[in-house]
Design a protein with these regions (language model features):
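Conserved phosphate-binding/catalytic region of the ribokinase-like
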Residues: 1-5, 151-154, 202-293
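Glycine-rich phosphate/adenosyl-contacting loop at the front of the ribokinase-like
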Residues: 1-59, 64-68, 75, 244-245
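Ribokinase/PfkB-type carbohydrate-kinase core domain
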Residues: 1-10, 71-85, 98-235
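Short, glycine/acidic-enriched loop or turn micro-motifs at the edges of active sites
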Residues: 12, 16, 62, 165, ...
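Residues at secondary-structure transition points
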Residues: 27, 31-38, 64, 89, ...
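Aromatic/hydrophobic pocket-lining residues that form π-stacking "cages" and hydrophobic walls in ligand
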Residues: 43-44, 69, 148, 278
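Short, basic and Ser/Thr-rich N-terminal targeting/leader segments
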Residues: 50, 88-91, 222
Length: 293
């Protein structure tokens, strides 16, 4: 069993499943639902479904949403400490999901912006660290998270980064993000993100460019599976066939499947398949978390 520290964010997802094309400036028929979310929190919750343990470092506001988010983490068995230490409201993400299951997100980081180094637990017993890119892209939490990464490196814990969407990354200079990638033992991206950071429209060239910065590069290819390269060794696996309902949280669930298996086995194929299997479960339902039942 592996124990993973997940650093970054927890939020409320407000999901609008569109029943028609958006009628700008007018009403659009949709189905609205709310779900707990946040990249780091999603990864932590999915990790608990792999017979591994997770501890979340994030913040919520002292508000009804915050109480509900903490209660939900407890139901999944995600460890945490002092999440409710911010004067800001809890984070919220509004998500539009089209008829193909693709999502467009409108994030408000909320209380997660107030992360501090003191939020870290003792590192004893941890096997690895996952860092949400949102926590680094937000200038208000960036310094604290970089200090957390420094401490994890001193403790010789493997660190994995998902830098988040290309749209979010464009708020920070690419050169700065590449410096963060160079601090990592591994980076997990989708096709678009890899081409953006890797500086090439050829995905394999982009992957090779990124591996000059970090020993492990994992690229999620959606319906075409996933690929990875580690110290020059390449592997690719197909996606697990499923009925796609909502892709929200697909990358988070993939990370939760991949990282513990990689730490256990060091086998690229096994780890990619573990990530793909968990992602298939995620996209078959609405929301970014596994069902509690």
């Amino acid at each position: 069993m592996k124990r993973i520290l997940c650093i970054g964010d927890v939020a409320l997802d407000v999901i609008a499943q569109l029943k028609e094309q958006i009628n700008y400036g007018n009403d659009t028929a949709s189905r609205i639902s709310t779900h707990p979310g946040g990249q780091a929190a999603n990864v932590a919750c999915w990790i608990t479904r792999t017979n591994n343990q997770a501890h979340l470092v994030a913040r919520v506001g002292n508000d009804p949403v915050g109480f509900a988010l903490v209660s939900d983490l407890d139901k999944y068995g995600v460890a945490h400490k002092d999440l409710m230490r911010s004067g800001r409201p809890s984070g919220v993400v509004v998500i539009l999901v089209d008829s193909n299951g693709e999502r467009t997100m409108f994030p408000d980081n909320g209380a997660n912006a107030d992360l501090e180094l003191s939020d870290l637990p003792d590192f004893d017993g941890f096997d690895g660290v996952f860092v949400s890119g949102y926590a680094l892209l937000d200038s208000r939490s960036r310094d604290a998270v970089l200090k957390m990464i420094d401490k994890a490196k001193i403790a010789k814990l493997p660190i994995f980064l998902d830098p988040t969407t290309t749209g979010a990354m464009k708020s920070v200079a690419k050169e700065e993000i590449l410096k963060w990638v160079a601090l990592m033992d591994g980076v997990l991206l989708n096709n678009e993100e890899a081409r953006y950071l890797g500086g090439s429209d050829d995905i394999e060239i982009a992957e090779e460019n990124l591996q000059k910065l970090t020993p492990l590069v994992v690229i999620k290819l959606g319906s075409r599976g996933a690929m990875a390269i580690h110290n020059g060794k390449f592997e690719k696996v197909p996606a697990v066939t499923t009925n796609v309902v909502d892709t929200t949280g697909a990358g988070d669930s993939f990370a939760a499947g991949f990282i513990p298996k990689w730490l256990q086995s060091g086998d690229l194929e096994l780890s990619l398949n573990a990530g793909a299997a968990l992602a298939a479960k995620c996209v078959a339902t609405v929301g970014a978390r596994p069902p509690l039942n």
